[in-house]
Amino acid sequence: MHRRALLTALAAMALAPAWAFHALPEKFDPQRDAAADVQQALALAQAQRKMVFVDVGGEWCAWCHIFDRFVAARPAVQKALQDHYILVKVNYSPQNRNEAVLSQWPKARGYPHFYLLDAAGKVVASQPSGELESGRDYDEAKLLAFLRRHLAAQ
């Protein structure tokens, strides 16, 4: 019985998407090495023929949490991100502004701010999140259009 459980677990791991196993941050963490996280995301993007979705913000940012909840509740958005992007969170807070990484890209005009990078690290899009909002939430159609519009750079 133990052998069967082990084989089942191994089969499940083999079939699961690769994004499920990398150690990129799920939260904004001022202690993380943002440069290393972005490099890891780029390596994964190259290996998987995807782009990188960089989410810049902080645990202090209400709209950052709204975005996380929005994505978690929208299967179409989750699918678009999982199919075409490696997601990486880069902290911006008084504890760590990650200036070395963020100075390489267009200046953010608020948070969260989204950058799309091709697998070589070139900025394909720099998007203030406010343009993707609708009322007190995000607009699914606007977000999906943003994600799809830049896939040609892949």
Regions found by a protein language model. Give the residues of each.
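N-terminal export leaders
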Residues: 3-7
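A short beta-strand-turn-helix
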Residues: 33-50
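Short active-site neighborhood of thiol/selenol oxidoreductases, capturing the structured segment around
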Residues: 49-59
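The canonical Cys-X-X-Cys-His
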Residues: 61-65, 114
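Typically the conserved alpha-helix immediately C-terminal to a functionally engaged Cys/Sec
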Residues: 65-80
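Thiol-based oxidoreductase modules, predominantly thioredoxin-like and allied folds used
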Residues: 77-97
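Structural micro-motif
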Residues: 105-115
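Non-catalytic, surface beta->alpha helical segment in thiol-disulfide oxidoreductase systems
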Residues: 113-153
